[in-house]
Design a protein with these regions (language model features):
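Phosphodiester-processing cores and adjacent nucleic acid-binding clamps
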Residues: 3-197
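A short, hydrophobic C-terminal helix/tail in secreted or cell-surface proteins
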Residues: 198-204
């Protein structure tokens, strides 16, 4: 399917630490996908953060040129820096260019109480500890999979953004299993229990 192909290409062809798909590849899919401007890690967010309106306008125009009505702007409320200011700056551009804004959540974990587990993984990746006073905290406990009701309550002052999001959902067909775990398999010698895997850690 298109989703699997995009994800595979993003992982296999990226020269960055995170999966990336280039703009030309996106253009090839213009008739099959809805393009959303992106959140805090997007070029648009960075341009408006620097108050570079002309660059932000150029980015928007480059997407609408190819995706037409299937390009929308995106705002989030995850209690992270600069989100409020970004919302204020993106509104005039949306009105000027006649582009809908959708409300999304930058989801990184399933439940709100998974936040500490996520932060632990981040610390492992960055060689930091949870109680390190100098550790940069770039994620929020609000980045969990919220229900429709929670999102509606979060954006109750601008419910049209939720309505725009619902319109996109009508164009998409997505399903995933939340009950099954997909974890790597580690070989264990015969006649040895899985506690064998903890031995190297205990020795260290």
């Amino acid at each position: 399917c298109i989703r699997d192909r995009v994800i595979s290409n993003a992982h296999n062809n990226s020269t960055y630490t995170s999966p990336v798909i280039n703009f030309n590849e996106l253009i090839e899919l213009k008739n099959d996908i809805v393009a959303i401007s992106g959140g805090k890690d997007s070029h648009l967010f960075e341009s408006l953060k620097r108050n570079n309106i002309s660059d932000a306008s150029r980015i928007i125009d480059s997407f609408t040129k190819y995706f037409k009505d299937d390009f929308v702007l995106e705002v989030q409320r995850t209690n992270r820096p600069d989100e409020v200011e970004y919302f204020k700056n993106i509104l005039p551009l949306a009105v000027e260019k006649g582009i809908p804004i959708v409300a999304t959540n930058d989801v990184l974990f399933a439940n709100q109480d998974d936040y500490e587990v996520h932060e632990t993984k981040v610390c492992i990746n960055t060689s930091k500890t949870l109680n390190d006073p100098n550790r940069e905290k770039i994620f929020s406990e609000q980045q969990y999979f919220k229900s429709s009701e929670q999102m509606e309550n979060l954006f109750k002052d601008c419910i049209s953004l939720i309505e725009n999001t619902n319109e996109i959902s009508k164009k998409c067909n997505v399903s995933f299993d939340t009950k099954e775990y997909f974890l790597p398999e580690y070989p264990v010698p015969k006649a040895v229990s899985y506690t064998h895997l903890t031995l190297p850690t205990n020795k260290a």
